[in-house]
Amino acid sequence: MTQTLSQLENSGAFIERHIGPDAGQQQEMLNAVSAESLNALIGQIVPKDIQLANPPQVGEAATEYAALAELKAIVGRNKRFTSYIGMGYTAVQLPPVILRNMLENPGWYTAYTPYQPEVSQGRLEALLNFQQVTLDLTGLDMASASLLDEATAAAEAMAMAKRVSKLKNANRFFVASDVHPQTLDVVRTRAKTFGFDVIVDDAAKALDHQNVFGVLLQQVGSTGEIHDYSALISKLKARKVIVSVAADFMALVLLTAPGKQGADIVFGSAQRFGVPMGYGGPHAAFFAAIDEFKRSMPGRIIGVSKDAAGNAALRMAMQTREQHIRREKANSNICTSQVLLANIASLYAVYHGPVGLKRIAQRIHRLTDILAAGLQQKGLKLRHAHYFDTLCVEVADKAAVLARAEAAEINLRSDIHNAVGITLDETTTRDNVLQLFTILLGDDHGLNIETLDKDVALDSRSIQQSMLRDDAVLTHPVFNRYHSETEMMRYMHSLERKDLALNQAMIPLGSCTMKLNAAAEMIPITWPEFAELHPFCPPEQAEGYQQMISQLSDWLVKLTGYDAVCMQPNSGAQGEYAGLLAIRHYHESRNEGHRDICLIPASAHGTNPASAHMAGMQVVVVACDKNGNIDLADLRAKAELHANNLSCIMVTYPSTHGVYEETIRDVCDIVHQFGGQVYLDGANMNAQVGITSPGFIGADVSHLNLHKTFCIPHGGGGPGMGPIGVKAHLAPFVPGHSVVQIEGMLTRQGAVSAAPFGSASILPISWMYIRMMGAEGLKQASQVAILNANYIASRLKDAYPILYTGRDGRVAHECILDIRPLKEETGISELDIAKRLIDYGFHAPTMSFPVAGTLMVEPTESEGKAELDRFINAMLAIRAEIERVKAGEWPLEDNPLVNAPHTQNELAAEWNHSYSREVAVFPAGVANKYWPTVKRLDDVYGDRNLFCSCVPMSEYQ
């Protein structure tokens, strides 16, 4: 025997599963790029002065089975109490058909944001359904396709109210005192950076305050009271005040739509439509507004347009509002939202339909009525007469009640003076209600559910007559058709087949890191020990979560070279915002709050300037030189010019041009010299892990896209996680939380997300990835990502010029193909190439970012040589097709590129093109053919004829 037992045990087996090319294929690619070894290649590409001598010590790799067992033991420390805490979070019943066929299905969770609508019609339809649910329940005209959570949606509502307000001199925002505390927390954080004054008072006093541009009300208050705000809203609107209302999807099934009462903006959490609490997330927020404000709305909006054949097709509408185009002038910095969770909520509505949803809502309310009746019968006082699912119960001996609840493994809301809060949900049973009677009244309460049920059924007044919904909702056929599991399963599969995800092909999107989301990483997110915890449960019930988060934080600290990590931001854009706030608060602590200039290279991600604007900073653009690098002379000149007011620089590394800039430490030194801080955008961290680190380079703070580098799937546009790493001097200034004390974080700052640890239930994905890869595996992943990019660049450079390279003609983990010379010469554009790739079975690379007229390709380490070669061969074949256009063999107005993509319907129809059917639809052969269901979208038509709700079923046929 030549192998040792340790070798046979092969603890690093997962590394070989995660990294696409095996050792032999890696050597073939190294030969193709004229490099002797991976280490030699990295030595040629990464500046010597920033290379780590040794990879960060995050432990050795574990097998999938060992890592799962280890995590199972950790999560076993969590205590699964029944939580009636409420405050915007409730237990749910996720239908198994949705769990199995969507949440656990890579055809859904590995797709990207639907920028390429032709390969995204399935999830676009599901998102359109989500918008329809929102429109029906809120009674408004326009809805978005989800925001990050309810609290950030409230902050977005405030910002939007100011944008659309006609009261230009007003600078005060009124918040009703019974909104959820975490909502108020996030609103206050956002208001401070915008310079708004937040007034918190009883809603009835909203009219007493002057210079108010917007008011935030909550239809069902945090402690349960249903409010009829119709008269107040009418008076506020007479004063031209913008009215936002926080609402609850399940309550809205029974309650009057806020839009019908005059609200301008309505938002809330869609969590209770089938999405587990997950210790705080991820959850989709819904957001709706009146038609007049549609172009000021934040987030993605799905609209109905037409394709080149005149058929109805879906797309993301009005993208000119968004950060990737408008930069610092964008309505919001929102990029990743919560598509996967919004689609769960929309499918929950489809599966239950209006009748099923009403039955669920009525059952919740009936059990709440029964609980209320029994408590009142025994002499307890309810603080509110009108309620849906939440009771505020006054108790004489609160400590004793809470002790009995704890003994019964039940959580009640405990932060209300002389009272406890109890929120029921769709999982609540009559036995649960009897148990609550015992806790509040003692064992001998003598109450009978059947008797109480008869009483409240005859005379329930807990929802005032004026607040009962009197209109039909979810009348569209899609919500009234798929109620058997067979029909639902087939409907979801029909949507999935329309889309292109990683389970079918490589997605070579530059700056997006579409790597493997391994099955072993995904398994823990559905474990009930992770899924069922309330984010505000006592910390001793979440010791497993705390241990997992602590370990993950420690690993990220070591991988980034920082001193602390804050897990709260629930997207990369939120991470940017949180990091910039830390910088801002740091300057304020030194009596330098005037420092508000943020330097941003011209090549930056659109979120950077949008986030800087949100953080109350002024953006100054730094030029790039002819090689795409930061122009040091321009940087120094602008840093010196703004020395007294310089706050920071936001820089991405490797750069968005796909190059390791040799002068990155000089950049850091210049900014530090003039009193600024260095924010290093973590979007390209997949080219750093194990090789270098932001802290080692000299940065002060970064966000990490766990949904890129650390394997959380993109979910078709979310969820994401954007924790920030900081140096020690910034650690006191990371986000805190008003409800939960974050252990180990000595911060007094406000929150940026609703939950203290953001989307905590997807953190196990990144924990599993790091645990299974270990230090050496993580470094190897970065190395192979760089090798794969250089292999593609080397193979394609003669057909498509590589726009930017570093020394020795190398690129980092992505490369930019310059299509501009081809377009000028032949008339074929980067858009034509992107759409033609669909016929070859590929999602397009990133178009026209960071340079217009280009395609940016990032293969990641997970793609094997065979798939890389398939992509390369497709690009070379397309280049040959362009030559045929150039030669006049195919006219510019009728060729397979400008007509791409081609559908089955087109194949079966009369053929009048200058090229054959075979060339159109089978350019790469017939094996594993992906069929788009629509032709190229008409973007102009879609924005000029905005239609953002469900279309007739005939359009789906």
Swiss-Prot record:
Residue numbers carrying N6-(pyridoxal phosphate)lysine: K708
Signal peptide: none
Catalyses which reaction(s): N(6)-[(R)-lipoyl]-L-lysyl-[glycine-cleavage complex H protein] + glycine + H(+) = N(6)-[(R)-S(8)-aminomethyldihydrolipoyl]-L-lysyl-[glycine-cleavage complex H protein] + CO2
GO molecular function terms noted in the UniProt entry: glycine binding; glycine dehydrogenase (decarboxylating) activity; pyridoxal phosphate binding
Cofactor(s), names only, from the UniProt record: pyridoxal 5'-phosphate
Keywords attached to this entry: Oxidoreductase, Pyridoxal phosphate
UniProt-listed GO biological process terms: glycine decarboxylation via glycine cleavage system
EC number: 1.4.4.2
Top EC class for this record: oxidoreductase
Cited SUPFAM superfamilies: PLP-dependent transferases (SSF53383)
Record text on subunit structure and interactions: The glycine cleavage system is composed of four proteins: P, T, L and H.
PANTHER family for this protein: GLYCINE DEHYDROGENASE (DECARBOXYLATING), GLYCINE DEHYDROGENASE, DECARBOXYLATING
Role according to the record: The glycine cleavage system catalyzes the degradation of glycine. The P protein binds the alpha-amino group of glycine through its pyridoxal phosphate cofactor; CO(2) is released and the remaining methylamine moiety is then transferred to the lipoamide cofactor of the H protein.
Official protein name in the record: Glycine dehydrogenase (decarboxylating)
Organism annotation: Salmonella arizonae (strain ATCC BAA-731 / CDC346-86 / RSK2980)
Lineage start: Bacteria, Pseudomonadati, Pseudomonadota, Gammaproteobacteria, Enterobacterales
